[in-house]
Curated annotation (Swiss-Prot):
<dbReference type="InterPro" id="IPR036569">
    <property type="entry name" value="RpiB_LacA_LacB_sf"/>
</dbReference>
<dbReference type="GO" id="GO:0019316">
    <property type="term" value="P:D-allose catabolic process"/>
</dbReference>
<keyword id="KW-0413">Isomerase</keyword>
<dbReference type="GO" id="GO:0004751">
    <property type="term" value="F:ribose-5-phosphate isomerase activity"/>
</dbReference>
<keyword id="KW-0423">Lactose metabolism</keyword>
<dbReference type="GO" id="GO:0019388">
    <property type="term" value="P:galactose catabolic process"/>
</dbReference>
<comment type="subunit">
    <text>Heteromultimeric protein consisting of LacA and LacB.</text>
</comment>
<dbReference type="InterPro" id="IPR003500">
    <property type="entry name" value="RpiB_LacA_LacB"/>
</dbReference>
<comment type="pathway">
    <text>Carbohydrate metabolism; D-galactose 6-phosphate degradation; D-tagatose 6-phosphate from D-galactose 6-phosphate: step 1/1.</text>
</comment>
<dbReference type="InterPro" id="IPR004784">
    <property type="entry name" value="LacB"/>
</dbReference>
<dbReference type="GO" id="GO:0050044">
    <property type="term" value="F:galactose-6-phosphate isomerase activity"/>
</dbReference>
<dbReference type="GO" id="GO:0019512">
    <property type="term" value="P:lactose catabolic process via tagatose-6-phosphate"/>
</dbReference>
<protein>
    <recommendedName>
        <fullName>Galactose-6-phosphate isomerase subunit LacB</fullName>
        <ecNumber>5.3.1.26</ecNumber>
    </recommendedName>
</protein>
<dbReference type="GO" id="GO:0009052">
    <property type="term" value="P:pentose-phosphate shunt, non-oxidative branch"/>
</dbReference>
<dbReference type="Pfam" id="PF02502">
    <property type="entry name" value="LacAB_rpiB"/>
</dbReference>
<comment type="similarity">
    <text>Belongs to the LacAB/RpiB family.</text>
</comment>
Length: 171
C-alpha cells in the first residue's frame, strides 16, 4: 500500500521512525516532508498529504505535528479528505470502519511512537464497513466541503513562509 506521510519540524524524527516502520511492513512511503528541524508551517505538509491521497497517488495518509491538532485541521481542508486525529486504537478503527477515513493524524509529542505505529498498522489493515447509515453520514460530511481554487496555487502559503523567514512566528 502507498502511504503519504507528512509532518512539521517539531516531529521530523518521529516521522522518520514511522516511515521506517511502514517500510518494514512492506508499504511504499511517499514522504512529503518536512525533512529536517528547520522551522516550517504545518499546514503545508497537511495539504501535501491530503493532495497525495485525494489524487490517488497514495492510498492513505498519515499526518504528525506536535499535538496533531494543527496538521489534522489543515489536511481536513483538502476536499475529499476524511482525517481523524487519534490517540487510541478504538478511535482509529472507528474512523476507518465507520467513516472511511483516508488520513490519520497524530500528536508526536502526545502519543508514544510504538503506540502510534500499532495504531497506524491497525488503521491500514482495517476495512470500511459500508452501511446505509455510514454512507449517508459520509455524504453529509462531504456536502460540507467547499472548493477554493486558490488552494491549487503552489504559492498558496508564501505569505506565511515569508513571515517565518522574518521570525514573526515562534515555537
Amino acid at each position: 500500500m502507498k502511504i503519504a506521510l507528512g509532518c512539521d519540524h517539531i516531529v521530523t524524527d518521529t516521522k522518520m521512525r514511522v516511515s521506517e516502520f511502514l517500510k518494514s511492513k512492506g508499504h511504499e512511503v511517499i514522504d512529503v516532508g518536512t525533512y529536517d528541524f528547520t522551522r516550517t508551517h504545518y499546514p503545508i505538509f497537511g495539504k501535501k498529504v491530503g493532495e497525495q491521497v485525494v489524487s490517488g497517488n497514495a492510498d492513505l495518509g498519515v499526518c504528525i505535528c506536535g499535538t496533531g491538532v494543527g496538521i489534522n485541521n489543515a489536511v481536513n481542508k483538502v476536499p475529499g479528505v476524511r482525517s481523524a486525529l487519534v490517540r487510541d486504537m478504538t478511535s482509529a478503527l472507528y474512523a476507518k470502519e465507520e467513516l472511511n477515513a483516508n488520513v490519520i493524524g497524530f500528536g508526536g509529542r502526545i502519543i508514544g511512537e510504538l503506540l502510534m505505529c500499532d495504531i497506524i498498522d491497525a488503521f491500514i489493515n482495517a476495512e470500511y464497513k459500508p452501511t446505509e447509515e455510514n454512507k449517508k453520514l459520509i455524504a453529509k460530511i462531504k456536502h460540507l466541503e467547499t472548493s477554493n481554487a486558490d488552494q491549487a496555487d503552489p504559492h498558496f502559503f508564501d505569505e506565511f513562509l515569508e513571515k517565518w523567514d522574518r521570525g514573526e512566528y515562534h515555537d
